[in-house]
Amino acid sequence: MAPTDASTDASTHASTGASMHTGPASTPTCNEDTLELRLTDDFLALLSEDGDARVGETEAGQESSPAKGELLDHLADWGPVVTPAGTLHLVPVRLERELPLISHWMNDSTVASYWKLAGPEDVTADHLRTQLAGDGRSVPCLGVLDGTPMSYWEIYRADLDPLARHYPARPHDTGVHLLIGPVAERGRGLGAILLRSVADLILDRRPSCARVVAEPDLRNFPSVSAFLSAGFRFSAEAALPDKRAALMIRDRLLRDLM
């Protein structure tokens, strides 16, 4: 789910395995969109401690499953990335803390048309819980830019996702979905800036990953444009269960050229 500008916020939800829901969309006010939540450095450090819990402990003699976080090289420890728009932290979501804000964004009419998570908070909560209760192959994150929460991200193992049935996946392909929350932040190129920076952060923090992939809805022209501006290339059209998608790829070998 990746968008750009006005639709980088509303486009790339699809393949994390969570069920899709629809519901009435409400139109947030401008004041609601720009919730002034600023986080101190100490609080940001506290938030980044979320994702290190280990899972998969088994009795002696049994093979253990991957520890929570290993499938994405411990995303919670990646640290901030400096972008032309400011310093961005990807902070793994805590449901009880971020649900009201993320649900508020999902009820924006433009966002709802692509993410299909409008409605009461329970709709968004179910989507988040599916990822949070999993094995760490998909990590929902809050994007905090210069201390202000302003975007929602899903970083996921595309090669382990249902998306892999619809394109020639390679081991460790990593997918990205982006929603820019505040309406005032859309339509001015911010999506492309953040997508490029996060894609390169993924490639820097995941040495085994050769490609970052995305599958925005083909109808979401601003989102597709943002990916192209962010150094992704259009690879193919993909007929997914919930949409016809543009398969976008950012290659490690080509990132200095695009």
Task: Give the ranges of each region predicted by the language model.
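Conserved N-terminal entry element of GNAT/NAT acetyltransferase domains
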Residues: A2-E96
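Helix-loop element at the rim of GNAT/NAT acetyltransferase active sites that forms part
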Residues: H104-A118
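Acetyl-CoA-dependent GNAT
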Residues: T130-P171, V183
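A short, internal acetyl-CoA/4′-phosphopantetheine-binding micro-motif in the GNAT/acyltransferase core
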Residues: V176-R188
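Conserved acetyl-CoA-binding loop-helix of GNAT-fold acetyltransferases
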Residues: G187-I202, S225
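Conserved beta-strand-loop-alpha-helix junction that forms the acyl-donor binding cleft
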Residues: V212-V224, P241-D242
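Conserved active-site alpha-helix within GNAT-family acetyltransferase domains
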Residues: L218-A236
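C-terminal "cap" of GNAT-fold acetyltransferases
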Residues: L240-M258
